Amino acid sequence: MFANRWLYSTNHKDIGTLYLLFGAWAGMVGTAFSILIRAELGQPGSLLGDDQIYNVIVTAHAFVMIFFMVMPIMIGGFGNWLIPLMIGAPDMAFPRMNNMSFWLLPPSFLLLLASSMVEAGTGTGWTVYPPLAGNLAHAGASVDLTIFSLHLAGVSSILSAINFITTIINMKPPAMSQYHMPLFVWSILVTAVLLLLSLPVLAAGITMLLTDRNLNTTFFDPAGGGDPILYQHLFWFFGHPEVYILILPGFGMVSHIVTYYSGKKEPFGYMGMVWAMMSIGFLGFIVWAHHMFTVGMDVDTRAYFTSATMIIAIPTGVKVFSWLATLHGGNIKWSPAMMWALGFIFLFTIGGLTGIVLANSSLDIVLHDTYYVVAHFHYVLSMGAVFAIMGGFIHWFPLFSGYTLNHTWAKIQFLVMFIGVNLTFFPQHFLGLSGMPRRYSDYPDAYTAWNTASSMGSFISLVAVILMVFMIWEAFASKREVSVMELTTTNVEWLNGCPPPHHTFEEPAYVKSNS
């Protein structure tokens, strides 16, 4: 029965499908917000007519894309679908908790949308800094609704993380060691640990903000002995691991895609890849204050955070060069998924280089809160995370659905998207270097040309998103079934057929140990 299958589901494949559908839907909402932002900035002068509304749209765009698009698709969608198949587990360790993790998200999303509709909305930016987020500058229920929304999304992610950690550590076949696991499994494991350690700190910070707003506490109010900088420390101690949470599953997916379409049976430097991910996860926790170079820290503090941030480039470089080495000498198949993966490597590297620039505290003091920062993190998110999601989706779509996408359309869609995102975000580096600040709805005429180009790019990206919806419809309408899958010996998720039966590995997988 429909309700029993989808509302009360305890099946990792069905829950993964729910996550993918929810993430796609939220992605449309987030894209709509971003189009509104670029429409406002397409030329000087006012379009929306109100800076508060503009800032509400910017805030909503960030929250929707991070908490309701990237995380549900990467961790909830691909994670749920692939982890049990890749380690030969019959399902997740806690199947009912898995269901709850998903069903906490729609109410959370609803609360976020509600927060935009009451009073004047939450126009604080996704960081929700006090005193702007306090009860004077943002009177009314809006910020409180946003905080509740974050609480629900946070609980969902924490439960999900516990579930993945338990599944990966406990539900492998006895002969399978940690170092026999596919890289995507490793990436989700590291991501889950990051979630488990960082989200409680965010919960503490926003709960204190909630009591500051409603119960007259003064955690972040200097008038009562508090300090708004404390909030920034708490937020960014979560916020920096969060950006690695958004990209690490992408690393895992790209490793699989690059290996598969290079015709290799394993990625180059498996152990290096694993340790690089663990290093990135660890280092991600000790660099948070590089988001706060402008709040007046001591010079030695800034020196430490600059150096520590730059160290992250080393394991990241290990991954990039290992992907290139995996490609080397391979029998390369130019499938759409491979194109997304190669686009990921190229554009993520550019985003990483601008990150190294921003790691220098002296430079960051000039570039902080300019469009240079926006360009940097959209290169790693809008062209890192999103390209990985697109590549993973196209690569594993036959596994999820049993049908194949039209490769010609998929390549056209990649090309349109590639042009669109680059035209959107490359000019923003120039705007930032010229000093155009973030989070303003208008700008001096001198910035017009690059902003117009950027807005043109965003509309091209919108065409690519619509093309993707068309491609998915076309695949289900044409019903081209998968005939044969190559390289299944080293890509075990395909072993049960396309799509796999509702229940897989009902008796444990037999793994022969080579160690």
Swiss-Prot record:
It comes from Mammuthus primigenius. Keywords: Calcium, Copper, Electron transport, Extinct organism protein, Heme, Iron, Magnesium, Membrane, Metal-binding, Mitochondrion, Mitochondrion inner membrane, Respiratory chain, Sodium, Translocase, Transmembrane, Transmembrane helix, Transport. Pathway: Energy metabolism; oxidative phosphorylation. InterPro entries: Cyt_c_oxase-like_su1_dom, Cyt_c_oxase-like_su1_sf, Cyt_C_Oxase_1, Cyt_c_Oxase_su1_BS, Cyt_c_oxase_su1_dom. CDD domains: Cyt_c_Oxidase_I. Coiled coil: none annotated. The gene is MT-CO1. Gene3D superfamilies: Cytochrome c oxidase-like, subunit I domain (1.20.210.10). Belongs to the heme-copper respiratory oxidase family. Its cofactor is heme; Cu cation. This is Cytochrome c oxidase subunit 1.
